[in-house]
Amino acid sequence: MAGISAGKTAVKGVKAIVFDMDGVLIDSEPLHLLAYQKYLANFALTFGEDDNHNFLGMKDLDCAKHLIKRYQLEMTALEFVGQKEKVLHELFNEQLKVQPGVFKTLEKAHQLKLPTAIASSATMPTIELVVELTRTSHYFQYLCSGDEVQNGKPAPDVFLLAAERLGVKPSECLVIEDTYNGVCAAKAAGMMCIAIPCQATKHQDFAHADLVLASMEEVKLEELIQPGSLA
């Protein structure tokens, strides 16, 4: 499994896989940008690609708090998230696409009896909508949301929650991420991490990932569960 670059930790002996969602399982970063733009247009406000890049991997609630403070909006963060999420869900229903190699990887994990979870900064309603639209709910033992933890990525909270629910040690978990914040969270949790940058995150620094691949198509699960090193 040839990587673009390799980190210091050997990717080996994987006993569970934890997937980020946005940018990893689905090509959603452009839709998040459009949702912010559509919602903030109601206030005659703009939201650019640089703004979206700064929010990649962060909890929706944290993003909302930042924007409310910046623009002095008279609403709570929960109200902001709820309204922006309505726009996002409409876009997901119309335009959502699964990333290349995802179905093959999930099916292989199922065949190998590797337990899997989603650990996303997104809200639980958004995660549930995605697995419904993509018809992948049967592949995941657990769904873990940024709603359920105190600290969002780059803190490790959501990944540690996933490991606890899966019943495995953090060191036995492989995280697949696409953002700098997500990789930081995975490594802070003591987990192995493969970064697969998406179009929106290809400019980010992934030197701290254990392995960087160009696509989910390059993930070879048979090798990951072996005790030998892939790095």
Feature map (PLM): residue ranges:
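Asp-based, Mg2+/Mn2+-dependent phosphohydrolase catalytic module
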Residues: 2-16, 107-110, 123-231
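Residue-level signature of catalytic and energy-coupling elements of molecular machines
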Residues: 36, 64, 120, 155, ...
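Hydrophobic beta-strand core positions in alpha/beta domains
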Residues: 117-118, 195
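Residue-level detector of anion-binding/catalytic polar loops
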Residues: 46, 115, 192
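Ser/Thr-glycine-rich phosphate-binding loops at phosphate-binding pockets of nucleotides
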Residues: 24, 28, 120, 182
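Residue-level marker of regulatory loop/turn positions in helix-turn-helix DNA-binding domains and
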Residues: 98, 119, 151
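N-terminal helical cap/lid subdomain that shapes the substrate entry/recognition surface
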Residues: 7-112
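Short, flexible loop segments at the rims of nucleotide/cofactor-binding pockets, characterized by
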Residues: 92-97, 121, 189-190
